[in-house]
Design a protein with these regions (language model features):
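N-terminal leader segment of winged-helix/HTH proteins
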Residues: 1-32, 98
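C-terminal regulatory/oligomerization modules of transcriptional regulators
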Residues: 1-6, 124-143
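Charged, amphipathic alpha-helical coiled-coil/dimerization segments
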Residues: 22, 50, 54, 72-135
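Short alpha-helical "packing" element that flanks the helix-turn-helix/winged-helix DNA-binding module
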Residues: 38-42
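DNA-binding alpha-helical recognition surfaces that contact promoter or target DNA
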Residues: 43, 69, 132
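Residues within the alpha-helical elements of helix-turn-helix
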Residues: 44, 59, 77
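Short helix-capping/turn signature of helix-turn-helix
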Residues: 45-48, 137
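Helix-turn-helix DNA-binding motif, specifically the short coil turn and the N-cap/start of the second
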Residues: 63-66
Length: 143
């Protein structure tokens, strides 16, 4: 019988790392007046490349109800405005307000600094290798 692996299980390492990285990102976003979920919504709304809220929710990996909650909150804060498409009332469009654009710019800086921080301990070759390895794990798990 084989003994225990020399390293902790990969899933545990990935989970711990994801939690640490996510918590650091959330703290940085909160200090700038936002959140990771608000940032994701602002990015997608600003890009304007999503067709329906269902497609947007899928792109974020959340449910439609959760997305609606986020959009409602951003709209209530005056960061996003929504309207029904004239040719198809079932389709809702969204855009950032001026305040939403200002928050987007602030959070983009935070996101870029966070990414630089993550990359700071790795060489360019290691960053590329990490990306390939993470993709390999994702494909191997089936998602």
């Amino acid at each position: 019988m084989n003994g225990p692996p020399a390293q902790p299980p990969i899933g545990l390492q990935l989970s711990r790392t994801a939690r640490v990285v996510t918590n650091a990102f959330e703290r940085a976003m909160a200090q700038a007046g936002g959140s990771a979920s608000a940032w994701q919504v602002l990015v997608l709304v600003r890009a304007g490349q999503w067709g329906t809220q269902a497609e947007m929710a899928e792109a974020m990996g959340i449910t439609g109800a959760t997305l609606t909650h986020h959009l409602n909150a951003l709209e209530d804060q005056g960061l996003v405005r929504r309207w029904r498409e004239a040719s198809n009332r079932r389709v809702q469009q969204a855009a950032l307000t001026e305040a939403g654009e200002e928050l987007f710019d602030r959070l983009r800086e935070v996101a870029m600094r966070h990414d630089q921080r993550l990359r700071s301990t790795l060489s360019e070759k290691e960053v590329e290798q990490l990306g390939r390895l993470l993709e390999k794990v994702r494909v191997g798990v089936g998602s």
